[in-house]
Amino acid sequence: MKLSNNTVQVLKNFASINQNLVIKEGNEIKTMSAMKNIVAKAQVEETFPKQVAIYDLNEFLGCLSLFKEPILSFKDTSVVITEENGSSGDSLEYMYSDPSVVTTPSKDINMPSEEVKFTLDDVMLSKLSKSAGMIGAPDLLLENNKLTVR
């Protein structure tokens, strides 16, 4: 299986919420912060053939980055990562974690319908995150001045 760029971006985002992740069979990925106060869910293009428990998601993403076009083969206890064209013969076997040591949402949370809806593109979010990091701001406040969200 080849992961789309969108799925890799979802995994990178989820790594900022929690370093570990359980991907269940199917095309839905969910994560929850260790404090259990942030939950995220995404539908991805790929359908995962089996449950995969990853203890360190950033480490796993780093392993993927070792390959130009990584192909994932899901085994019983590991995922084998190879190059798409297979010419180099390089491969990496990444062992699954024990799911019992990984923080994962056990059930879906039914959220009320949104009160406010807006679009925040990745360029603006990156700029806001970088600015907040530079001044050490732990939170981000969005205000509506009826014209723009700032």
Where is each model-derived feature located?
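Conserved mixed alpha/beta catalytic, RNA-binding, or beta-rich assembly cores of soluble enzyme
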Residues: 105-107
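Charge-dense, extended regions
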Residues: 99-101
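DNA polymerase processivity clamps
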Residues: 1-95, 111-150
